[in-house]
Design a protein with these regions (language model features):
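Long, charged, low-complexity intrinsically disordered regions
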Residues: 1-42, 49-52, 63-81
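A generic structural motif
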Residues: 53-58
Length: 81
């Protein structure tokens, strides 16, 4: 999905009902992706990881994640969940 829009998903499947936010569609290399993941984790005050070209943030923090990404000038869309 490389249409220039970053999508923020809420997912519970396979996580015992615990919600996580998944950020997909970022065109960043591994180092930049990890740095953005660290900033999002600080903004949300929670844990998370960056792997397979996605950022996973623990908990339902879609509003904060969308606001932070839009502040960085990215086109963001809430999707799923």
């Amino acid at each position: 999905m490389q249409d220039g829009i970053v999508r923020v998903w809420l997912e519970r499947k396979g996580r015992n009902g615990t919600p996580v936010c998944i950020v997909r569609g970022l065109a960043l290399d591994g180092v930049a992706l990890a740095a953005l993941a660290a900033q999002l984790k600080r903004t949300c005050g929670t844990g998370g990881t960056a792997k397979d070209g996605e950022i996973i943030i623990q908990g339902d923090h879609r509003a904060r994640v969308v606001a932070e990404l839009e502040a960085r000038g990215l086109r963001v869309k809430r999707a799923g969940g």
